[in-house]
């Protein structure tokens, strides 16, 4: 709605959200202007709006964000190479987002409480198993996406997440990192992967 504050949010070196700029919605639109040294993951947050966050890649160029608070599937990011790629990744995983949403809608109240009876414990375990299956499918899709989109910032973000959550071996992450252009290695995510590699590679070699 017009007059709504829109916040541009990035993260500091510890991953803590950091508001970077604020504008107001005017005539149903908002605009941020500025320059950035390198691409980074960011999001715009709409004040007092349920599900009012939209993730995108902050980089130089014109990025267009279409936001629909009533139908999140209509949210769209476009305009730069990385954001087009990010949107294609999101589009490919809409079915998974729908599955997660359906589980929450069907079991929201139940998931708020501690299971007490045997029947409740079985149901809770079933929900956990369902989430685990979805997570495994998501991890597989992320790895497939990385394999098809080597040397891109979006793939780097996915590798960073997979590597930090122990879903990717250090040797595989190193293979990916070594093939990156220097400008990608210099991003916050590139430095983060390098730092984690320095810790994890010796541990992996020691186990071998």
Question: Which residues does each predicted region cover?
Answer:
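N-proximal helix/coil linker or "cap" segments that precede and/or mark the start of modular domains
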Residues: 172-208
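Amphipathic alpha-helical coiled-coil segments
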Residues: 131-149, 168-172
């Amino acid at each position: 709605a017009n007059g709504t504050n829109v916040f541009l949010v990035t993260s500091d070196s510890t991953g803590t959200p950091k508001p970077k700029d604020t504008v107001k919605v005017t005539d149903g639109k908002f605009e941020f202007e500025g320059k950035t040294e390198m691409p980074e993951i960011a999001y715009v947050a709409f004040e007092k709006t349920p599900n009012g966050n939209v993730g995108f890649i902050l980089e130089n160029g014109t990025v267009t964000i279409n936001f629909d608070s009533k139908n999140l599937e209509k949210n769209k990011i476009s305009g730069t190479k990385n954001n087009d790629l990010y949107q294609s990744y999101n589009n490919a995983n809409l079915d998974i987002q729908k599955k997660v949403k359906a589980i929450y809608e069907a079991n929201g109240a139940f998931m708020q409480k501690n299971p007490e009876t045997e029947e409740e414990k079985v149901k809770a375990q079933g929900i956990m198993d369902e989430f685990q299956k979805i997570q495994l499918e998501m991890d597989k899709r992320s790895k497939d996406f990385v394999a098809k989109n080597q040397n891109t910032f979006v793939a780097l973000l996915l590798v960073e997440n997979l590597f930090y959550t122990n879903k990717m071996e250090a040797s595989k992450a190193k293979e990916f990192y070594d093939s990156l252009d220097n400008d990608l290695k210099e991003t916050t995510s590139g430095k983060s992967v390098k730092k984690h590699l320095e810790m994890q590679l010796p541990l992996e070699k020691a186990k071998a």
